[in-house]
């Protein structure tokens, strides 16, 4: 697959999964848009989204479904809630090959849910660089988050997930692009 094809698929996967499969027409107000609700998705939509991610990451289907189904079946109605899914999007290469048999794989498998996490202190776009031989190698962990219509508590403290990094996606107003943000211990 050519680089152009990979980049095209990466964009489609990100937008289709986060904007269509997990949310209604507009994503949560926490992402900078207007709709505060998150909807369930049917089995066909979930399978399409799962296949889209697996195509990019080459991770086993069972790993993806364990994380995603935990959210879809048990937690979508518990608001606020945050889900960490095993997304990996490389800028120029498929990083699953570079990270194979590496303890850093644990970063990709966190499906711990936590609630009432304020996004107000998270600002800049982040692409976390991995120390590999490829200078352009990078990955971004994505999360899908939904909150109740009530205001977020400014005193709430986000809990660190099972992995070392917790990454939250928030929509920015720069041409409606996505800003991927992270917090580390």
UniProtKB/Swiss-Prot annotation:
- Stretches the record annotates as Disordered: 146-168
**Biological process, per Gene Ontology:** meiotic DNA double-strand break formation
Q: Does the keyword Transcription apply?
A: yes
InterPro entries (UniProt xref): Rec104
**Keywords on this record?**
Activator, Meiosis, Transcription, Transcription regulation
Q: May I ask which residue range the UniProt record assigns to the signal sequence?
A: none
Task: Show the Pfam families listed in the entry.
Answer: REC104
Job of this protein: Potential transcriptional regulator that is required to activate expression of a number of early meiotic genes including HOP1.
For this entry, the protein name equals: Meiotic recombination protein REC104
């Amino acid at each position: 697959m050519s680089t152009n094809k990979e980049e095209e698929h990466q964009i489609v996967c990100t937008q289709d999964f986060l904007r269509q499969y997990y949310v209604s027409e507009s994503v949560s107000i926490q992402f900078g848009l207007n709709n505060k609700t998150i909807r369930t998705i049917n089995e066909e939509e979930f399978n399409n989204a799962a296949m889209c991610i697996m195509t990019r990451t080459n991770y086993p289907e069972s790993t993806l479904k364990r994380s995603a189904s935990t959210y879809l079946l048990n937690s979508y109605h518990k608001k606020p809630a945050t889900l960490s899914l095993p997304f990996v999007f490389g800028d120029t290469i498929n990083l699953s090959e570079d990270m194979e048999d590496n303890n850093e794989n644990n970063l990709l498998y966190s499906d711990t849910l936590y609630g009432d996490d304020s996004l107000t202190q998270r600002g800049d776009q982040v692409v976390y660089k991995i120390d590999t031989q490829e200078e352009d190698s990078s990955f971004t962990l994505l999360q899908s988050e939904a909150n109740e219509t009530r205001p977020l508590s400014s005193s709430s403290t986000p809990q660190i997930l099972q992995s070392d990094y917790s990454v939250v996606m928030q929509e920015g107003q720069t041409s409606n692009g996505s800003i991927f943000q992270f917090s580390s211990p």
